[in-house]
């Protein structure tokens, strides 16, 4: 069992399961929110640079 920081008690199975569930939810949130936002910003930057440097 994992030692909790600053505490004498060790992590129980229930606490471990909850921690793993929270980590999984955090990872899913990154995949569904952060990556698409980063891609959108990157695409907007490419479009801006292309339009600023093109010779219309």
Curated annotation (Swiss-Prot):
Region Disordered, annotated ranges: 1-27
Source organism, top-level taxon: Eukaryota
Pfam families: DUF4519
Location(s) in or outside the cell: Membrane
Membrane topology field: Single-pass membrane protein
Entries under InterPro entries matching the protein: DUF4519
GO cellular component, one term: membrane
Residue spans crossing the bilayer: 30-50
Keywords: Coiled coil, Membrane, Transmembrane, Transmembrane helix
Coiled-coil positions: 9-31
UniProt cross-references to PANTHER family, sorted A to Z: SINGLE-PASS MEMBRANE AND COILED-COIL DOMAIN-CONTAINING PROTEIN 4
Family designation: Belongs to the SMCO4 family.
Protein name (Swiss-Prot/TrEMBL): Single-pass membrane and coiled-coil domain-containing protein 4 homolog
Gene source species: Nematostella vectensis
Taxonomic placement: Eukaryota, Metazoa, Cnidaria, Anthozoa, Hexacorallia
